[in-house]
Amino acid sequence: MQQDGQAEEPMIRRAKAYIAGHHADPIGLDEIARSMHVSTFYFCKMFKKSTGLTFTDYLSRVRVEKAKDLLMNLRLRVSDIAYMAGFQSLTHFNRLFRRLTGECPTRFRDNNSNRANALETNFKDGRFASKGIVSLAA
């Protein structure tokens, strides 16, 4: 999500890569800015200009996207998924997930579980193997 069609600053690319790799860890704005050798104010300004989102909103969206992926694994409990995605509170996770997706995590899982089950079944039955697609879980 880049604004104005400008090339993304290396600082922002590094910050986004760090967030992607550490979304489950507590990530502080001051910590990120310091690691980029800039003030918190400057980092916030540049991050918002580049992504169109505040640092906190961007981090929340990354965590919700990770949670959406994890919700496809029907063996994981929603509470475990919340913590795996980086949320410190199940209540906060539920509230934010609903605000960003329009539905609660359980409903999201239910609405998408048929797709997840079909993919799992097709991999187990070898239906994708004939098309050159193999399961990485095997």
Question: Which residues does each predicted region cover?
Answer:
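Terminal helix-turn-helix DNA-binding modules in bacterial transcription factors
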Residues: 13-21, 26-30, 49-89, 110-138
